[in-house]
Amino acid sequence: MTNIRKTHPLLKPINHALIDLPTPSNISTWWNLGSLLGTCLIMQILTGLFLAMHYSSDTTTAFSSIAHICRDVNYGWTIRHLHANGASMFFMCLYLHIGRNLYYGSYSYLETWNTGVMLLLTVMATAFMGYVLPWGQMSFWGATVITNLLSAIPYIGTDLVEWIWGGFSIEKATLTRFFTLHFIAPFIILALVLTHLLFLHETGSNNPLGISSNSDKIPFHPYHTIKDILGLLIMILTTLALTLLHPDLLGDPNNYTPANPLNTPPHIKPEWYFLFAYTILRSTPSKLGGVLTLICSILVLVIIPMTHTAKQRSLTFRPISQCLFWILTADLLILTWIGGQPMDPPFTTIGLLASILYFTTILILTPTAGLIENNLMKW
């Protein structure tokens, strides 16, 4: 008798995607991050749904509604901090996932890679809008600074900013539309995730060697599901430890002060996961130049497949490119650190040098290293 999961119209696609999926036998723990990101997304949707039941998207009551959630709602403080720290875990997994794809050359699956970049941009936009909702000092001023960047666009910039604000400054209309968009965005992300998986399952997964694995594949369940559960437990324990022991570790103390348009914080900064892009933005002297470099810092991922010059796909046997990959990783950590510092020497100089190194490594040094390695291999 045929198993129902292989014949039922609803269960058959799930079976092909999660149970009987032919998977390379040699993929490492770095391939766990996709399932971790899926778990993070589900957790964010569920906690966000419960928060939305009690949140008020009005400038006069938004801050107090967050206080009400934490004080009066059963386990409201847990849900709120799970949502905030869950976002941090989401970005941690997201950046590790991108790093793994860069290291092992998975960007050569163009459709999967490009939908992944679209996902990254959508998740970043969603997180930014979510950061505005508590209506604390950093929420208000962060939103003011970032949305104001659009005014650098020639001709239409000022009109565009006022259209996004729904007025001449950030006010009730802005908060309402940010809440609406923040609520709907995870479902758009969910649709993009399905597209991402659809393209991935068209080609099959890459592997650490970067070679075809058609001759050696195993079913996803039980082998890789067991491996994924270990990563899942580690992530859940880390998130719970962060939420229950140090809930405000990754937040900003200024957000415990209600938004005040008349009092500017001494140092405006976004959440830690945007700091690298924020450093690149403020290291550029002109406003329009800063906006362009900010956009390019993310969209540079789209052109990485075009800059691949090596004959080998993965970095596993390419020592020069490996060194450059870890230099890029260290550079991103430096950019993140500088983003949290005030705009004073020597931080401005370090930020400028790190920003230049970021683009140079991706666009010039890595393609050059690929050509050198081809010559060393006599290819």
From Swiss-Prot:
It holds the Pfam family Cytochrom_B_C. A ubiquinone binds at H201. Gene3D superfamilies: Cytochrome Bc1 Complex, Chain C. It is found in: Mitochondrion inner membrane. The keyword Metal-binding applies. GO terms for molecular function: metal ion binding; ubiquinol-cytochrome-c reductase activity. GO terms for cellular component: mitochondrial inner membrane; respiratory chain complex III. Its cofactor is heme b. It comes from the Eukaryota. GO terms for biological process: mitochondrial electron transport, ubiquinol to cytochrome c. Keywords: Electron transport, Heme, Iron, Membrane, Metal-binding, Mitochondrion, Mitochondrion inner membrane, Respiratory chain, Transmembrane, Transmembrane helix, Transport, Ubiquinone. Binds 2 heme b groups non-covalently. It is a multi-pass membrane protein. Heme b b562 binds at H83, H182. The keyword Cytoplasm does not apply. Heme b b566 binds at H97, H196. The chain crosses the membrane at residues 33-53, 77-98, 113-133, 178-198, 226-246, 288-308, 320-340, 347-367. The cytochrome bc1 complex contains 11 subunits: 3 respiratory subunits (MT-CYB, CYC1 and UQCRFS1), 2 core proteins (UQCRC1 and UQCRC2) and 6 low-molecular weight proteins (UQCRH/QCR6, UQCRB/QCR7, UQCRQ/QCR8, UQCR10/QCR9, UQCR11/QCR10 and a cleavage product of UQCRFS1). This cytochrome bc1 complex then forms a dimer. Heme 1 (or BL or b562) is low-potential and absorbs at about 562 nm, and heme 2 (or BH or b566) is high-potential and absorbs at about 566 nm. Belongs to the cytochrome b family. Component of the ubiquinol-cytochrome c reductase complex (complex III or cytochrome b-c1 complex) that is part of the mitochondrial respiratory chain. The b-c1 complex mediates electron transfer from ubiquinol to cytochrome c. Contributes to the generation of a proton gradient across the mitochondrial membrane that is then used for ATP synthesis. This is Cytochrome b.
